[in-house]
């Protein structure tokens, strides 16, 4: 548990020297493979299981473009806007306005890109959708920082449509409850070891 500092234990640091989550250790190989950073984990799993990654080179490059866009942009949303708007002990106007402006610029970019598209790479759901939805999708659905009204997310209609559609996916519903330790206990799955674990919860 990160609240107890488990990420600083020697076992965790061996898997991820940066002592952050998410971290993955794949034991299905002759030698365990340590994978850390969400983008790296998504790419590793997509290639390992040959899923959620386009096969065509042009679409694969497009997917990588947006995956790495999320990696570089999300800190402005989370560590920037999210921190000063939601977590900082003192509400400071300048950083809130500064990071809100950048977050809205990013949302506008996504909104334009998603026009006439079901997903980031067209009609195919990929790891770029998974990465971007986790932050920007949940933000537009009002699940992050209670900032939907402040950021006027309803004006980004293409992003909202995309976010709502992904939110309805059965795997997304399952994924949202894994390792969840707050909120309604009926929708928490603190550990997941097999697909049978989900049978205990009605989604």
Annotate each language-model stretch with its function:
Residues 1-107, 111, 118, 201-203:
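GST-like domain detector, emphasizing the conserved glutathione-binding G-site
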Residues 14, 168, 177:
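Phosphate-coordinating loops and pocket residues in cytosolic domains that bind phosphorylated ligands
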Residues 24, 41, 110, 129, ...:
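Residue-level signal for nonpolar/aromatic packing positions in well-ordered secondary structure
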Residues 46-50, 71, 115, 135-136, ...:
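Hydrophobic/aromatic-lined pockets within catalytic cores
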Residues 77-82, 120-149, 153-160, 165-166, ...:
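GST superfamily/GST-like fold recognition
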């Amino acid at each position: 548990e990160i609240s107890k500092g488990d990420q600083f234990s020697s076992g965790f640091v061996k898997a991820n020297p940066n002592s952050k989550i998410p971290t993955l250790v794949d034991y299905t190989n002759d030698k365990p493979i340590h994978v850390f950073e969400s983008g790296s984990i998504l790419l590793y799993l997509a290639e390992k299981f040959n899923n959620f990654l386009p096969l065509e080179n042009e679409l694969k490059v497009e997917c990588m473009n947006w995956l790495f866009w999320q990696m570089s942009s999300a800190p402005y949303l989370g560590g920037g806007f999210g921190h000063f708007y939601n977590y900082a002990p003192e509400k400071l106007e300048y950083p809130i306005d500064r990071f809100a402006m950048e977050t809205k610029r990013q949302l506008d970019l996504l909104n334009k890109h998603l026009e006439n598209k079901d997903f980031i790479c067209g009609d195919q759901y990929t790891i770029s959708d998974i990465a971007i939805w986790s932050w920007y999708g949940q933000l537009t659905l009002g699940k992050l920082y209670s900032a939907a009204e402040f950021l006027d997310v309803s004006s980004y209609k293409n992003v909202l449509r995309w976010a709502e559609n992904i939110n309805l996916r059965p795997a997304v519903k399952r994924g949202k409850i894994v390792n969840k330790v707050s909120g309604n206990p009926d929708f928490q799955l603190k550990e997941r070891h097999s697909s049978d674990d989900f049978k205990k919860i009605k989604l």
